[in-house]
Amino acid sequence: MMYQPELETLPREKLRALQEERLKRLVAYVYERVPFYRRLLDEAGVDPKGFRGLEDLPRIPFTKKTDLRDHYPFGLFAVPREEVARVHASSGTTGKPTVVGYTKNDLKVFAEVVARSLAAAGARPGMMLHNAYGYGLFTGGLGLHGGAEALGMTVVPVSGGMTERQVMLIQDFRPEVISCTPSYAQTLAEEFRKRGVSPEELSLEYAVLGAEPWTEAIRKQVDEGLGVKSTNIYGLSEIIGPGVSNECVEERQGSHIWEDHFLPEVVDPDTGEPLPEGKVGVLVFTTLTKEAMPLLRYWTGDLTFLTYEACTCGRTHVRMGPILGRTDDMLIIRGVNVYPTQVEAVLLAIPEVVPHYQIVVRREGTLDEAELKVEVSEPFFREIGQEVLSDEVVEADHRLHALRERIARKIKDNVGVTLKVTLLPPGQAPRSEGGKLRRVLDLRK
């Protein structure tokens, strides 16, 4: 099923023509309404009256997160604050949040693209969605909620946390679809396993997972643990929120970007030059239809690639690959380039832990010191019978001590860097208010 089949299957030449028209209109719109963009375009020598559309797009400088922070809170709004129907904000690692505004029409588009995404993931009108994304300033909860209602679903707005209650509601209400972070889906699967509830006893059929990077190994764990087909939903609050793209349940080989609203590019992280199809680079978006806070060439920092290969689902919109990392997530520790995904691959091969972790880097004098905080699995935690996992407890328990040493050794062998390993009880890895795992904390900056 498709939510908007005519738009989702638009022939590429018609889709490109629509993008051309909307891009030209957007450049004129922000030039007139947003002083920041007027200065940016003037300095780049881009005149909206002579702007030729897609071929001129690379002439426009990138918009970066620092630009949003420099104009906090409402300096990039293109409409009077009174015309803004809703404000969301993403929690930054430091300082003020990144604020995004939405007009009533922006919220309508938001609901439509999420409805498209849910339908691509297998959801249908009349199904029930157990929405375990956080509600509030974080876009996840309200974003999925609005899209599900637009699709005609029944929404259970359970939000994040309270795992025991979530387990009860899933068993009692019997929803067909769940939306949450991949790590929380793993938590729920483990909780059902602990209670002796098999996947076959659950009503769940589809899981819509996002808000943090995940791997095919995690997908396999979730699919088997909950008895679902899980798809990736991608988005970021600066662009609109969740629903910028979603995998189709037919292939699950890349997420369809809704290109009539979000114009994607992949560029070289060092030079900023556009890269051809299939090459990995930084994902950049231009919002073609946003009214309250449109963005030109927004640098997401996410590393991925694009493919225009035809999809068996029939959708014509370009697909993006998985997020392979972030330009700001790569850590250089004592001269070694370290990506969180490398560490995660090691952890996935160790059954006593789960890939819920944080890498913390500090500077001690002139040297970098790195710590890996990682959760042990529920079964292992029960087996060792400890209430806390302090350094003293780990040193005294030969199983914990051996596990800590094994993790450190495998990371040294596979990643090439020595990390101090700290074992955490289940559920104790640092998370943001929206429930997202915070994989990297670089305290050297």
From Swiss-Prot:
It catalyses: 2-phenylacetate + ATP + CoA = phenylacetyl-CoA + AMP + diphosphate. SUPFAM superfamilies: Acetyl-CoA synthetase-like. It is an enzyme of class 6 (ligase). Disulfide bonds: none annotated. Pathway: Aromatic compound metabolism; phenylacetate degradation. One of its GO terms (molecular function) is ATP binding. Keywords: ATP-binding, Ligase, Nucleotide-binding. Its EC number is 6.2.1.30. CDD domains: PaaK. One of its GO terms (biological process) is phenylacetate catabolic process. InterPro entries: AMP-bd_C_sf, AMP-dep_Lig_C, AMP-dep_synth/lig_dom, ANL_N_sf, PA_CoA_ligase. The keyword Nucleotide-binding applies. Optimum temperature is 75 degrees Celsius. The enzyme is heat stable. Monomer. Catalyzes the activation of phenylacetic acid (PA) to phenylacetyl-CoA (PA-CoA). Involved in the phenylalanine metabolism. Belongs to the phenylacetyl-CoA ligase family. This is Phenylacetate-coenzyme A ligase.
